[in-house]
């Protein structure tokens, strides 16, 4: 989920996730096949021994015959995804992300005994992140296979969100359930010049078109450990250079990120990578520009936008990344001006952490605040989520919470009309010994 640079806000590896599942399935199949071969071999050996042994051989044959094990089929994900990942990993040991060793002056961390000890102490914390990451991988890979032009954005968004809730095992319909697991924030489906924070509200009839460039940005969480990852879908290869530029820029940011690294250095590296690309559209060459007022960000428990920003252009921010922090490294490229403004109807909202206590005169605002606190806490939500909980005629109260400084609204962020924007994003953990790209998968 994008972090925007505004004065208002300033004030306030695995390629093995599916690979592991496939490997496990393959291993089960191979084991069962091996058992069948062993049984067959035993029977052949017994048959050869029978003429020599007679009745005694029959007894020996019975003794030598191996006992067949019960063959339990490997658990696999359904289509659409509905099997909780906890059922696929019953020992609660989830695949780790891509492991990247620290470089330069931080290379000692990989072998330092004290750092290794600290890393082992964080196992529960890591398993929650890895479980959420596995949910994200399985859901997004299904989405990539099935999303097609002609679908409504509502159908796409709800399909992704329903899958995340099913795989985390938290439907979010009971008070407090969504705080335990489920959607980390609403599924963003931002089209073409719209770069971020667009999800359909009730009644939206927008349909995905063949020539669209759609950013798919959603989060999954377990116990508030939010995995924030995004990708861009197109159905025309003419946009491939744009996607390649943004993917390269994001991977550059991931490579440069690390403990004690300055934000300005990361931004400079990202910009250099991104702006080395250009894309030809309708016979005109367009340089790919970084969207300079969109950033990556750190992630705190139950809070998608922490207090630090990761720029995607060169700047003077001397803030450093620190050990134990979690960051969403996301980059946005555009064929337009490389600058976004708020536009279109707002759908995303979030309770402001440590918001001041303000007397509310509207009873609808008071009631809605109670619903938000009990169901979302500081996790972002959208209007469809309130509809899903059975809330009605809440818009006046919601706007009152926004104007009172209790809830933050996140309007869609758009470049100039006619331009195209793309996004790729991963969540990384700055562990004491290594950097873990927790959301990495076979797809990106």
From Swiss-Prot:
Entry GO MF terms: initiator methionyl aminopeptidase activity; metal ion binding; metalloaminopeptidase activity
E.C. numbers: 3.4.11.18
Highest taxon of source: Eukaryota
Enzymatic class: hydrolase
Location in the cell: Cytoplasm
Catalyzed chemical reaction(s): Release of N-terminal amino acids, preferentially methionine, from peptides and arylamides
GO cellular component, one term: cytoplasm
Pfam families (alphabetical): Peptidase_M24
Gene3D superfamilies per the UniProt record, alphabetical: Creatinase/methionine aminopeptidase superfamily, Winged helix-like DNA-binding domain superfamily/Winged helix DNA-binding domain
HAMAP family membership: MetAP_2_euk
Protein name, as recorded: Methionine aminopeptidase 2-1
Organism annotation: Neosartorya fischeri (strain ATCC 1020 / DSM 3700 / CBS 544.65 / FGSC A1164 / JCM 1740 / NRRL 181 / WB 181) (Aspergillus fischerianus)
């Amino acid at each position: 989920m994008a972090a925007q640079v505004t004065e208002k806000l300033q004030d306030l590896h695995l390629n093995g996730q599916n690979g592991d599942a496939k490997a496990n399935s393959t291993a089960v199949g191979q084991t069962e096949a091996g058992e069948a071969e062993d049984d067959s071999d035993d029977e052949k050996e017994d048959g050869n021994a029978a003429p020599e042994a007679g009745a005694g051989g029959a007894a020996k044959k019975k003794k030598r015959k191996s006992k067949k094990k019960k063959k339990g089929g490997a658990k696999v994900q359904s289509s659409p995804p509905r099997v909780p990942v906890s059922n696929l990993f019953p020992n609660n040991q989830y695949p780790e992300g891509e492991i990247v060793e620290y470089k330069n002056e931080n290379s000692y961390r990989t072998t330092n005994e004290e750092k290794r000890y600290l890393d082992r102490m964080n196992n529960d914390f890591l398993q929650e992140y890895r479980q959420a990451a596995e949910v994200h991988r399985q859901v997004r890979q299904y989405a990539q296979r099935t999303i097609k032009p002609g679908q409504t954005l509502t159908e796409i968004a709800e399909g992704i969100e329903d899958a995340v809730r099913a795989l985390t095992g938290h439907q979010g319909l009971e008070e407090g359930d969504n705080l335990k697991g489920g959607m980390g924030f609403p599924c963003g489906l931002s089209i073409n010049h719209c770069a971020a924070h667009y999800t359909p509200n009730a009644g939206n009839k927008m349909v995905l078109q063949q020539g669209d460039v759609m950013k798919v940005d959603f989060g999954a969480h377990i116990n508030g450990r939010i995995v924030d990852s995004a990708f861009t879908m197109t159905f025309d290869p003419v946009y491939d250079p744009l996607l390649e530029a943004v993917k390269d820029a994001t991977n550059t940011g991931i490579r440069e990120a690390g403990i004690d690294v300055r934000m300005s250095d990361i931004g400079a590296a990202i910009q250099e990578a991104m702006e080395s690309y250009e894309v030809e559209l309708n016979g005109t060459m367009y340089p790919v520009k970084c969207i300079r007022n969109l950033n990556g960000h750190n992630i705190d428990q139950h809070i998608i936008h922490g207090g630090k920003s990761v720029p995607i252009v060169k700047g003077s921010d001397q803030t450093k990344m620190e050990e134990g922090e979690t960051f969403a490294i996301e980059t946005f490229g555009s064929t337009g001006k490389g600058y976004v403004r708020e536009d279109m109807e707002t759908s995303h909202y979030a309770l402001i952490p440590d918001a001041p206590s303000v007397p509310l005169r509207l009873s609808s605002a008071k009631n809605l605040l109670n619903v938000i606190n009990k169901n979302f806490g500081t996790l972002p939500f959208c209007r469809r989520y309130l509809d899903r909980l059975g809330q009605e005629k809440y818009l006046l109260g919601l706007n009152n919470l926004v104007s009172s400084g209790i809830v933050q609204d996140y309007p869609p962020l758009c470049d100039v009309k006619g331009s195209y924007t793309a996004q790729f994003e991963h969540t990384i953990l700055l562990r004491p010994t290594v950097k873990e790209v927790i959301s990495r998968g076979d797809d990106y």
